[in-house]
């Protein structure tokens, strides 16, 4: 009797993708990226810019300060690193 194994094709949950600018590349295989979020003020309606700095994994060290990069959320790689570099969208001038 040969039984066929049920192949489970579980989809991964959708991961967050963000675009930001590299503000530091002094660590090995790690870059610090500033992400900008625009929110509307609850009462006055003015658009406010909020920025967050996150650490991202850059395996090959291709990103430099000032580069515009695309990040994707990933499993925790260290205590503070939860993002990885997908691609460099635009090199710094």
From Swiss-Prot:
GO molecular function, one term: structural constituent of ribosome
Organism whose genome encodes this protein: Rhodococcus erythropolis (strain PR4 / NBRC 100887)
Family of the protein in this entry: Belongs to the universal ribosomal protein uS17 family.
Gene: rpsQ
Protein name per UniProt: Small ribosomal subunit protein uS17
PROSITE patterns tied to this protein: RIBOSOMAL_S17
Single Gene Ontology BP annotation: translation
Classification via InterPro entries: NA-bd_OB-fold, Ribosomal_uS17, Ribosomal_uS17_bact/chlr, Ribosomal_uS17_CS
Function per UniProt: One of the primary rRNA binding proteins, it binds specifically to the 5'-end of 16S ribosomal RNA.
Record-level GO cellular component terms: cytosolic small ribosomal subunit
Record Pfam families: Ribosomal_S17
Subunit structure: Part of the 30S ribosomal subunit.
Keywords (A to Z) from UniProt: Ribonucleoprotein, Ribosomal protein, RNA-binding, rRNA-binding
Coiled coil (UniProt feature): none
